[in-house]
Swiss-Prot record:
GO terms for biological process: base-excision repair. Keywords: DNA damage, DNA repair, DNA-binding, Glycosidase, Hydrolase, Lyase, Metal-binding, Multifunctional enzyme, Zinc, Zinc-finger. Belongs to the FPG family. This is Formamidopyrimidine-DNA glycosylase. Monomer. It comes from Novosphingobium aromaticivorans (strain ATCC 700278 / DSM 12444 / CCUG 56034 / CIP 105152 / NBRC 16084 / F199).
Length: 270
């Protein structure tokens, strides 16, 4: 599943051809993805000017001058394509700008979603209302995590994946951040020290910023809107490296937490 860096990279790529442009044509090529497309999607977007782009958690935002925002989620396999050579069966939504640029939302597994939300009420929209702070924003501080983790016996790895605690973190980057902060993923949240939390926050930010700079991490279906792959996977220190040596001389181990693979070094993560 595309995580925060992949969505941020996607939004930035789309902005290069969409921001400030009028959407001349909208083609909705099927009725639904994970849930139905808004019935008025084509009508609401046709002729609208894009006034800005953004991201909240793992959602991309396309703001228009009609005070409506198109909110998209890439699901498991979704990606946007800019000026594709052809429109295939998995290109379920197509936008054409006044300058003739074409953007298609391609989603083979159809776990993504597209919604229309009143721009002024975005934070009240149910999927956003309970979200925690953005990990790259000023709201994520060690004291925020300390309060959220206080008295919790759940593993710190699982708590960091809770979108109500921190918005947008996913499996890959939580594994990598915990490794950099030298925190064992199974440690109870309430037992993570203030010192460790002080290391964790900058580790989260560093991992995300480095991944965004590398264009994200390409696993199976993800690619940037320009068709290029994300290259952060080559910099993974533990994720996907079960049995490989750690820099400390230990060996990377894999366990399962909450149905997801966790990678860590038992020697240097305590």
């Amino acid at each position: 599943m595309p995580e925060l860096p992949e969505v941020e990279t996607t939004v930035r790529g789309l902005a290069t051809v969409l921001d400030g442009q009028v959407i001349r044509r909208v083609a909705v090529n099927r009725a639904d993805l994970r849930r139905p497309f808004p019935e008025d999607l084509a009508q609401a977007l046709t002729g609208a000017r894009v006034t800005g782009m953004g991201r909240r958690a793992k959602y991309g935002l396309i703001h228009t001058d009609r005070e409506r925002t198109m909110v998209f989620h890439l699901g498991m396999s979704g990606r946007w394509r800019i000026d594709p050579e052809d429109i295939g069966k998995h290109d379920h939504l197509v936008l054409e700008t006044g300058e003739g640029r074409v953007l298609s939302l391609n989603d083979a597994r159809r776990f993504g979603s597209v919604d229309l939300v009143d721009t002024g009420r975005l934070e009240e929209w149910p999927p956003f209302a309970a979200l925690g702070p953005e990990p790259l924003g000023p709201g994520l501080k060690a004291r925020h995590l300390a309060k959220a983790f206080e008295g919790r016996i759940a593993a710190v790895k699982l708590l960091l994946l809770d979108q109500q605690i921190v918005a947008g973190l996913g499996n890959i980057y939580v594994c990598e951040a915990l490794y950099r902060a030298r925190i064992h993923p199974e440690r109870e949240g309430g037992k993570v020290s203030a010192r460790a939390l002080g290391l964790l926050v900058p580790a989260i930010r560093a991992v995300l910023e480095e991944s965004i700079a590398a264009g994200g991490s390409t696993l199976r279906d993800y690619a940037r809107p320009d068709g290029e792959l994300g290259y952060f996977a080559k910099d993974w220190r533990v994720y996907g490296r079960e049995g490989e040596p750690c820099q400390c001389g230990g060996v990377v181990k894999r366990i399962v937490q909450g149905g997801r693979s966790t990678f860590f070094c038992p020697r240097c993560q305590k």
